[in-house]
Amino acid sequence: MICAVYKSGRRADTYLFVKKRDVFDDVPEPLMEMFGSKTLVMIVPLSKRDHLGIADIDKVKVALVEQGYYLQIPPPQINLLEQHKQELAFKK
């Protein structure tokens, strides 16, 4: 299985995996609008890979078969100030 990976021009660290290069028929229109301009990052042979950055390769494969695409969004950013405040509150 091979897929094309595109980087979002609108959202940092957001990637769209599709089954074929430049074929976005399975991707919902609202998602395409949110994604913004697309930049091809790479073509990936999934069958030859064990891991895929922060994405779970098995979830990517299933999503490509069932939906025709996979959207990778970055993990939520940790608010270090809030985390520090919570730690201080627990110490009281």
From Swiss-Prot:
All residue ranges annotated as the YcgL domain in the record? 1-85
InterPro entries cross-referenced by the UniProt entry: YcgL-like_sf, YcgL_dom
Q: Which HAMAP family does this chain map to?
A: UPF0745
Q: Which PANTHER family match?
A: PROTEIN YCGL
Annotated protein name in UniProt: YcgL domain-containing protein Sfri_1738
